[in-house]
Amino acid sequence: MFKRTGSLLLRCRASRVPVIGRPLISLSTSSTSLSLSRPRSFATTSLRRYTEASSSTTQTSPSSSSWPAPDAAPRVPQTLTEKIVQAYSLGLAEGQYVKAGDYVMLSPHRCMTHDNSWPTALKFMAIGASKVHNPDQIVMTLDHDVQNKSEKNLKKYESIEKFAKQHGIDFYPAGHGVGHQIMIEEGYAFPGTVTVASDSHSNMYGGVGCLGTPMVRTDAATIWATGRTWWKVPPIAKVQFTGTLPEGVTGKDVIVALSGLFNKDEVLNYAIEFTGSEETMKSLSVDTRLTIANMTTEWGALTGLFPIDSTLEQWLRHKAATASRTETARRFAEERINELFANPTVADRGARYAKYLYLDLSTLSPYVSGPNSVKVATPLDELEKHKLKIDKAYLVSCTNSRASDIAAAAKVFKDAVARTGGPVRVADGVEFYVAAASKAEQKIAEEAGDWQALMDAGAIPLPAGCAVCIGLGAGLLKEGEVGISASNRNFKGRMGSPDAKAYLASPEVVAASALNGVISGPGIYKRPEDWTGVSIGEGEVVESGSRIDTTLEAMEKFIGQLDSMIDSSSKAVMPEESTGSGATEVDIVPGFPEKIEGEILFLDADNISTDGIYPGKYTYQDDVTKDKMAQVCMENYDPAFSGIARAGDIFVSGFNFGCGSSREQAATSILAKQLPLVVAGSIGNTFSRNAVNNALPLLEMPRLIERLREAFGSEKQPTRRTGWTFTWNVRTSQVTVQEGPGGETWSQSVPAFPPNLQDIIAQGGLEKWVKKEISKA
């Protein structure tokens, strides 16, 4: 139902509203609509609180009340993302305005760790730290492996709790729920702040106007010790919603559709800001926003930020009125909410975005993701025709197992009871697992009767926590089985056997599928007779009554997009600079190799996730030996990898390498295999942080991937020894490829690998680097 013109994805009928987008450049001063497009030749790329001294949990450094004043016109217009980062950046020069691309020293309002708290604590102690810089900044939750009652796991949990008590850190034991949900419902992730976590789904905090982004274990240890860590402000994409969702269409359908329809890495390593008219944004509840923000991770983004608006204000005031504990009430204090909305932080007029995307919500229908990929999204009505039998269904995860989700699933069964006049059960041969996002959300569902409705239908309860979503505990998919889940990630092997098939869908569709035994919906959605496709594409929609409804304002937007287009287009068409004798050479830090050379080992696949690199079943086994890590490296992607790879090989893969979870072992297992360098077409940001922090160098070389696919595409293998030689001269920033004995030799310039990153790697990673820096103090 789509057609492409240039890089604009258009519905097969005229747009209902003007779009500033592609495919041709035109300017009309008689209209508020301006069109801008890239020429075809350009490529688009129960809380246990331990305190040593009494202190308010709302006090951090910088102050949680230091939100920028949006009415004070800055010299440099900023996006909402840039404004929030500005408020939590240390050491900025006087008059400096944070912009995308800046490296900043970030002091987050909060930092959450979960089951990985103990490995983080070991890093914290290894760098020589003895005292947590700001205990109020840290939150610990146990949520991933809560069904594991082994002595080893219980001892680890005990060690985490003891550490929290010793340092006065807020601690939530196993059974209280998924850490991200706790951060939301307990008010730690507060609007207008920066909140990070050592988990890839920190993006979820954007659902409440809090800039949430993932960090990795080493970053978390650094924050514990110093209160800060480095961060590069990503390019920022504005995603504009228009219209409202039809009945039967949910937030899960929105993000599944976005991930599947914009599936060419359009927002890879971007920060996202979701916008829309007042009517549109009011139609999206906070729970809906949390679902969308949560899965911006799977879409490839580093943040997914919703506005600080009236919908959020109503939610906050409800939380303030119903907070039952003193500590929670303090975080949702009326005074704090009043201060926030007395002058809410918004993007400035004229703020520059690197990309503009849009989606008309009214044209959307229920969607299903998979199998085994979030980049494959299919309208439910198409899948229903195939009557795909399922073996397991899951209503789990921080994405979609809040009380509202449980209510939606329960309604499917209640409606079936009303239709049949008698009890209904989960289909024969289907196992339906349910785990609430938190203990508090489960209590709400129980009081409403929704939890019991699912249990009466034969659902299998699991403790509040991550459950099957992380691939741990009861109910994992077995070889050959098919499952459908309301969770966020369906990568191969993520939820059990690599030989199973996993689909993702809304709670309603999961419940209906469990009831019917095949992938199906509850029948609520009715497609309009005049529907001709999903309205989605690149560009900015100009809506009547919006702030872009004068010629002058449209001109400002046109100029901003023109600047962005010229910049990215010139990069796309200009030849890469060669490094000749007159080129500036890079200084080499002692201990860092001047040259890295080896045979190219080609893993011909895009979107290899961290689950593919290092299976989830090993992630929380903290005593896995280096030899074992090397043995299981890439196990989910290619079981034969271990026998093919050799020490010293240059690891080369496709695009969006290292997407998915923030597990550190994805990098350290490659190092354990004695592979000195990872090269890919593009690399996920969180994996990049893990790699550098653990002393694994990286390069992005799209041209090399394209050439390898030209040479070996006719006989595709998961892992191939190519016989090609790869040589990276770090000093001259030059890569030379010898395409096998007697083959072509060619060279390419690559970005300089700066001495500061060399130093971290030469020291053996960020942990050892920080330890060295502390010893200097």
Swiss-Prot record:
GO terms for molecular function: 4 iron, 4 sulfur cluster binding; homoaconitate hydratase activity; metal ion binding. The gene is lys4. It catalyses: (2R,3S)-homoisocitrate = cis-homoaconitate + H2O. This is Homoaconitase, mitochondrial. Transmembrane segments: none annotated. Residues 52-74 have a biased composition (Low complexity). Induction: Expression is slightly increased during growth on ethanol. Catalyzes the reversible hydration of cis-homoaconitate to (2R,3S)-homoisocitrate, a step in the alpha-aminoadipate pathway for lysine biosynthesis. Residues 47-74 are annotated as: Disordered. One of its GO terms (biological process) is lysine biosynthetic process via aminoadipic acid. It is an enzyme of class 4 (lyase). The lineage of its organism: Eukaryota, Fungi, Dikarya, Ascomycota, Pezizomycotina. It comes from the Eukaryota. Pathway: Amino-acid biosynthesis; L-lysine biosynthesis via AAA pathway; L-alpha-aminoadipate from 2-oxoglutarate: step 3/5. Pfam families: Aconitase, Aconitase_C. Keywords: Amino-acid biosynthesis, Iron, Iron-sulfur, Lyase, Lysine biosynthesis, Metal-binding, Mitochondrion, Transit peptide. The keyword Metal-binding applies. Binds 1 [4Fe-4S] cluster per subunit. The keyword Lyase applies. [4Fe-4S] cluster binds at C398, C466, C469. Residues 1-35 form a transit peptide. It is found in: Mitochondrion. Its cofactor is [4Fe-4S] cluster. One of its GO terms (cellular component) is mitochondrial matrix.
